[in-house]
Amino acid sequence: MFVDQARIFVKGGDGGNGIVAFRREKYVPMGGPSGGDGGRGANVILVADEGLKTLMDFKYRRHFKAERGAHGQGKNMHGAWGQDLRVKVPVGTVIKDDESGEVLADLLLQGQEAVVAKGGRGGRGNARFSSAINKAPSFSENGEPGEEKWIRLELKLLADVGLVGFPNAGKSTLISRVSAARPKIADYPFTTLVPNLGVVMTKERDTFVLADIPGLIEGAHQGLGLGHEFLRHIERTRVILFILDAAQTEGRDVVEDYRILYRELELHNPDLLKRPQLIVANKMDIPDARDNARRLESELGKTVHCISAVTGQGVEELMGKTYALLQAAPQEIPSGEEPVVRRFEEELPFKIDKVDGVFEVSGPRIEKLVVMTNFNSDEGLQRFQRTVIKMGLEEALKEHGIKEGDSVRIKDFEFEFTE
């Protein structure tokens, strides 16, 4: 089964907790704090691997969680960092944020990597909080939670040349003749349900990769037929061959076929039509095909290359011309993805909503503070109070009409407001 889309959940490892410890050694009467920091949580990293051809593995496993960092120890010993989780994906995989659709990475090269979920930093041990005012702090930080998100993986094949045509135009027959690829061939539409790749060798022993992609129909740019399945894979090709049924065996007109194919590519992505292309009239072994090819050339005013994929007539010459076009084509084809433009504005530390009589406070900074605070320590609680006051939470709550004894909730931490 060829799987070219997947949706997976990734979570970076949580940071290890810092600890509270003091030196208790003979001959060290004033040992002081010695709690070590927690280790950093591991990242989730996707790695491009030429050995993989589909996203099939992600059909059965959808959750990937990296290990957390180790907790700190006494004697100022820091916790070990988590070992990064590396997940292999096929070369040509595009990684997108599932919620926003933003392209996070496009893995085009063997071994190329992308960090998709960062591990949290380790919490600081009490030794970090020692100061002239507080020489023996009895609190530490918890580790920071790792980043987590759902992401989408889309595989776009890396081929030099793409075959564009209606179902039963003879694309599969052509690729089976010019390469060792053996796609399924039969006399009904959509025989090819998955892309096929073949390596072509010209008579001069030059090689290139040809993609036989599922047949196109009118309305494909809107997803009809195999629409988006087809169009996604054609985006990376550097040369396009329009394969047309000149014998009109399906009852369609060959000129109209070309115009529909051209229009579908234009509606999907006009840049596709800027690439080098050849118009190929197939099935020259069938009566009337030659006359239809002449009519096609006359009406379009463009050169039409006549072949028979069944008998091999004209195929060798076509592959030579295709390679010549490929040599002149740009080496890199843009992905077609819209650039993401961000306008950076000052981020508010929190926002306040009143829900069922409870003042709910949310925001990345203040939620991170809650998660990393050890509320079992009086000093840790006092540090939390000082920090939120500096952030302006107390004044903001008063502006929202909070009164003595009202409840405040930040993530899972709930407390009563007192002045």
Swiss-Prot record:
Chain ranges of the Obg domain: 1-158
GO BP of this protein: ribosome biogenesis
EC id: 3.6.5.-
CDD domains xrefs: Obg
Subcellular location: Cytoplasm
Record domain OCT: where: 342-419
Chief site of localization: cytoplasm
Pfam families assigned: DUF1967 (PF09269), GTP1_OBG (PF01018), MMR_HSR1 (PF01926)
Gene Ontology, cellular component aspect: cytoplasm
SUPFAM superfamilies listed in its UniProt record: Obg GTP-binding protein C-terminal domain, Obg GTP-binding protein N-terminal domain, P-loop containing nucleoside triphosphate hydrolases
EC class name: hydrolase
Domain spans labelled OBG-type G: 159-327
UniProt-listed InterPro entries: G_OBG, GTP-bd, GTP-bd_Obg/CgtA, GTP-bd_prot_GTP1/OBG_C_sf, GTP1-OBG_CS, GTP1_OBG_dom, GTP1_OBG_dom_sf, OBG_GTPase
Binding site for Mg(2+): 172, 192
PROSITE patterns: G_OBG, GTP1_OBG, OBG, OCT
Family, as annotated: Belongs to the TRAFAC class OBG-HflX-like GTPase superfamily. OBG GTPase family.
Function according to Swiss-Prot or TrEMBL: An essential GTPase which binds GTP, GDP and possibly (p)ppGpp with moderate affinity, with high nucleotide exchange rates and a fairly low GTP hydrolysis rate. Plays a role in control of the cell cycle, stress response, ribosome biogenesis and in those bacteria that undergo differentiation, in morphogenesis control.
Name of the protein in question: GTPase Obg
Organism: Syntrophomonas wolfei subsp. wolfei (strain DSM 2245B / Goettingen)
